[in-house]
Regions:
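The Walker A/P-loop phosphate-binding site
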Residues: 1-88
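Catalytic phosphate/metal-binding cores of nucleic-acid and nucleotide-processing enzymes, i.e., regions
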Residues: 22, 154, 192
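Cytosolic-facing regulatory segments adjacent to core modules
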Residues: 24, 60-147
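Generic enzyme active-site microenvironment
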Residues: 67, 153-154, 195, 221
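Conserved nucleotide-binding/hydrolysis micro-motifs of P-loop NTPases
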Residues: 69-73, 126-130, 158-160, 197-202, ...
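Phosphate-binding/switch loop-helix module in NTP-utilizing enzymes
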Residues: 121-187
């Protein structure tokens, strides 16, 4: 034990979230760690994690994301809207339905294209087998070797395919996949963010680590577990 290298925690590099209150509590997101994020549907998990990736790029880190819920173009638009900010977002209306939507201005889009180039990478979930755990892990490893990515996102655990034939196999598959992500984070000294939806909780207002759906190994293997909820005015 006495021969273990002495490391000053303050010297370890971390990627800040850009949320001062959160950064002051955890010191940022450190290499070789896995963070699990949970919360009710529509609570803002994907939005916040998209912002964390943008913040990482702003800190000269390269990032790689897997999204099992959004197509590539929808994921891109979501990230671009966040990165552009309100000054460079235009409100438009569909001439047939009247539905309003928001779009990044051409000026800002061109700037963001140049800013994100070779810094922000997205796994292609439309490719055959692109949502299997083997494909995700393989692409993540390639992103480290080829592009030097240091921050990763899996959004979300339920969208990955494990080849399970029953519930028991599915939960073991989830646990094994989380274990592979932990090993990947430690081996490559990167940080992995993982979105895991909570199980049904009969309207419970506050969610904790025990509310994460699937196997308990998901949170047991994580370095950080965060629960997001949308607060309403009382």
């Amino acid at each position: 034990l006495s021969g273990v290298e002495n490391v000053d925690p303050l010297s370890l590099p971390s990627v800040l979230s850009g949320v001062p209150a959160l950064d002051s509590l955890i010191g940022g997101f450190y290499p070789s760690e896995l963070s699990v994020w949970t919360g009710k549907r529509g609570g803002g998990k994907s939005t916040l994690l998209g912002q964390l990736l943008v913040e990482a790029v702003n800190q000269r880190q390269r990032v790689c994301a897997y999204s099992g819920e959004l197509s590539a173009w929808r994921f891109r638009e979501w990230i671009y809207l966040q990165a552009a900010g309100p000054a460079f977002i235009e409100r438009k209306a569909d001439k047939f339905s009247g539905r309003e939507f928001y779009s990044v201005s051409p000026f800002a889009r061109k700037k963001l294209d140049a800013w994100f180039a070779r810094k922000f990478f997205l796994c292609d979930n439309s490719a055959p087998g692109g949502n299997s755990e083997d494909a995700i892990c393989s692409l993540f490893s390639y992103a480290v070797r080829r592009y030097g990515c240091a921050v990763f996102l899996v959004d979300n655990l339920m969208s990955a395919r494990f080849g399970a034939s029953n519930d028991g196999d599915f939960y073991r598959g989830q646990s094994n996949f989380v274990g592979r992500l932990v090993e990947f984070a430690k081996r490559e000294e990167v940080h992995v963010h993982l979105v895991a939806h909570p199980r049904k909780n009969d309207g419970k207002a506050m969610l904790d680590a025990d509310e994460v759906g699937g196997s308990g190994d998901i949170t047991n293997r994580a370095d950080n577990v965060f629960s997001l909820q949308r607060l309403t005015e009382q």
